[in-house]
Amino acid sequence: DKLPAGEFGVMHGRMPVSQLKKVAHGYHASLNEYFVAVFVWSVYKELLHGMPGGKPIRIAVPVNLRPYFDSDTTKNFFVMVSAEFRPQKESYTFEEVLACIQSSLHSQINKEHLEDLFSYSVSNQRNLLMRPVPLFLKNIAMRIVYEKSAVANTTTITNIGNIKIKDIYQPYIEGFSAFIAMSKGQYLKGTICSY
């Protein structure tokens, strides 16, 4: 069923992490690579019906920069990379889609490339020509840039990671759920967390 304008649906799934790791490792993939590939595979099979497409399926994936730059900051410290699959032939297996996703992510998730992305982002913030521009104009410009970048990607998948809590709180918590706000042009999104 189609939802009314201005509303969105949320679907939650829960699975044992140990079993997911076993399946992902069976494909020689990390959990992130596996989830992104499953999402791309689903779009390829269900929306494109396994046919070649003119546009790539592009998934925005946030990358935590802390391990690459030895940082303990509690602020958001990440950049976005885009895992890309471009269906050009009649039929792909899941393994072929996964290999494309892994290649795409591996080519971008390395210290040199992440440093370039981070430096570009910081240079925009420190641009002396932008300092006298009123904040409301900067906010409008940022909204336009954000919307254009969101439309450039089919969807976004983020992995919050393993959520740890103090032992004294564990009896009161059954699990965690998370979701990402909707973006123009991205009507499906995924959030992963483990507990």
Segments the model singles out, each with a brief description of its role:
Residues 1-9:
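Short amphipathic alpha-helices and their capping loops
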Residues 9-23, 44-195:
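Acyl-thioester-dependent acyl-group transfer interface
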Residues 28-29:
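A short glycine-centered flexible hinge/capping loop motif at secondary-structure junctions
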Residues 32:
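Glycine-rich acyl-CoA binding loop
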